[in-house]
């Protein structure tokens, strides 16, 4: 189950990065910053899940 959640986080990060690039191309600075904040949050979630999975498997 955690593996699926981790994959979902990684997919979200990829999508947000794409959206941030689109916002940048449209000079939507505020939107880009908001999306970058989401990327930070999702990255933290993914890293936490990776740690949990690593600790659980050892």
Which positions does each model-derived feature cover?
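Iron-associated oxidoreductase/ferritin-like identity signal
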Residues: 1-58
């Amino acid at each position: 189950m955690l593996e699926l959640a981790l994959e979902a986080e990684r997919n979200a990060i990829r999508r947000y990065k794409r959206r941030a690039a689109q916002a940048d191309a449209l000079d939507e600075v505020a939107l880009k910053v908001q999306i970058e904040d989401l990327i930070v949050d999702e990255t933290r979630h993914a890293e936490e899940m990776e740690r949990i999975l690593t600790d659980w498997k050892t």
